[in-house]
A protein has these predicted regions:
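Active-site proximal loop and beta-alpha junction motif in alpha/beta enzyme cores
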Residues: 1-73, 79-292
């Protein structure tokens, strides 16, 4: 069996930056174990498998795998596969069946291999647990306890499909100094995935409002994490006034793969009513695997 795939860089318009993604076309013939093994072979943070949708009203169904496990939802695969489908079908919107639900993405074509996608997150963020003591967090991240927290923002645990420990730090300098090669990580951050999204406000920087880094034992550091940005809508919304607010988060700078994630928040009074994630993606290559 031969399978074809595209390679995209997501949350960027520049090749060899952003977060790389493999998109396997026509994956209906693959079993779950085969998809997991293909994702492990390609060894990117995520690989997307396009399948026939259950409903004819939808563009495609997708399965999302890391090299280690399947995910019900992830932001950079959603943006990347939406751009790939939008360019292929020459359409301005796609409806994608993911395990978390059906996601509608609005597509803007930039050129023959580049596009922009935005989607409303299928579930608004929820508190998913209690954060560790900031002294333990600081020790795990190689920081001082007084560097944990940013203004009114404190550590939280949120999910918009995937659980993250959301850890604000004092400034961009503290964010850049984080080191995770320390023992006891899973004990400090015990919830599934053991994933930490560290972030800070960046009023001194032009072009973005926040900077972030994501760490998880299975992945190491990730260049751009849409599902974490979706979870971050929870605490960020508490800083927003009534109406629509747009933020830009930079990620991946410390890895040499700069990324730009767009976040949109709407509040009606004190109630969070809408969250969206957006960004660019471009096709940088294609290939095939012989599975027999």
């Amino acid at each position: 069996m031969k399978i074809d795939y595209l390679l995209l860089d997501v949350f960027t318009r520049t090749a060899l930056s952003g977060n790389p993604l493999a998109v396997v076309r026509e994956a209906d013939g693959l079993l779950d174990d085969q998809m997991q093994r293909v994702a492990n072979e390609l060894n990117l943070s995520e690989t997307v498998f396009i399948r026939r949708p259950k409903s004819e009203r939808h563009t495609a169904a997708v399965r999302i795998f890391t090299p280690m496990r399947e995910l019900p939802f992830a932001g950079h695969p959603t943006v990347g596969v939406a751009v790939a489908l939008g360019l292929e079908h020459k359409t301005s919107a796609v409806r994608i069946e993911e395990q978390i639900g059906v996601i509608t993405c609005v597509i803007e074509r930039i050129d023959r291999r580049t596009g922009h996608a935005r989607f409303a997150i299928p579930h608004l963020p929820l508190v998913a647990g209690k954060p560790p003591d900031k002294t333990k967090i600081a020790l795990a991240l190689g920081l001082e306890p007084d560097e944990i927290g940013c203004g009114m923002l404190k550590p939280t645990v949120h999910t918009a499909g995937v659980v993250y420990y959301l850890v604000p730090v004092r400034n961009a300098q503290a964010l850049a100094r984080i080191e995770t090669q320390r023992g006891g990580w899973n004990e400090v951050f015990p919830l599934p995935m053991h994933a930490v999204y560290a972030y800070t406000a960046t009023p001194e920087e032009s072009g973005n409002d926040y900077a972030a880094r994501m760490f998880a034992p299975d992945l190491g550091e990730d260049a751009a994490t849409g599902s974490a940005a979706a979870a971050l809508i929870g605490p960020l919304s508490e800083q927003c006034e009534d109406g629509m607010t747009d933020y830009v988060i930079r990620q991946g700078m410390e890895m040499g793969r700069p990324s730009r994630i767009e976040v949109q928040i709407r509040k009606d009074g004190e109630q969070l009513t809408h969250g969206a994630i957006g960004g660019d993606a471009l096709i940088v290559g294609q290939g095939s695997l012989e599975l027999d």
